[in-house]
């Protein structure tokens, strides 16, 4: 996937990606945080998903912290430093996985395992 800088360049974008990273990978290793951010930007670049960070994150049924309200809470207070740094790096072009999906690893899906997640 080719990430277009015009799609991801704003401060709001960084804060939004950082909040999702904290919600989905707050207790994961830093590589896991980078991978979650990579999935978001890979989706933005894919024709199968909305073409904006906000569109991808708020797409119905995709990220459970959005549905539960946890994402809104983290976004309002600001993500932790590690998640914010990971978001900055991913937006800057450090895409660490070429995947569109991830989930908690229960051993049933083949993919790249990082921490407690599998990326596929």
Model feature map: region roles:
Residues 1-13:
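Single conserved hydrophobic/aromatic residue that forms the stacking wall/gate
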Residues 10, 14-120:
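Bacterial extracytoplasmic/cell-wall-associated proteins, especially those involved in peptidoglycan
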């Amino acid at each position: 996937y080719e990430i277009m800088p015009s799609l991801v360049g704003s401060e709001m974008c960084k804060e939004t990606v950082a909040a999702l990273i904290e919600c989905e990978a707050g207790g994961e290793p830093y590589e896991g945080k980078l991978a979650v951010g990579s999935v978001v930007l890979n989706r933005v670049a894919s024709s199968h998903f909305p073409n904006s960070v906000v569109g991808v994150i708020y797409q119905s049924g995709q990220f459970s912290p959005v549905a539960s309200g946890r994402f809104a809470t983290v976004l309002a207070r600001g993500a932790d430093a590690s998640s914010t740094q990971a978001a900055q790096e991913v937006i800057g072009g450090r895409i660490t996985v070429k995947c569109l999906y991830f989930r908690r690893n229960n051993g049933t899906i083949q993919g790249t395992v990082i921490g407690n997640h599998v990326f596929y």
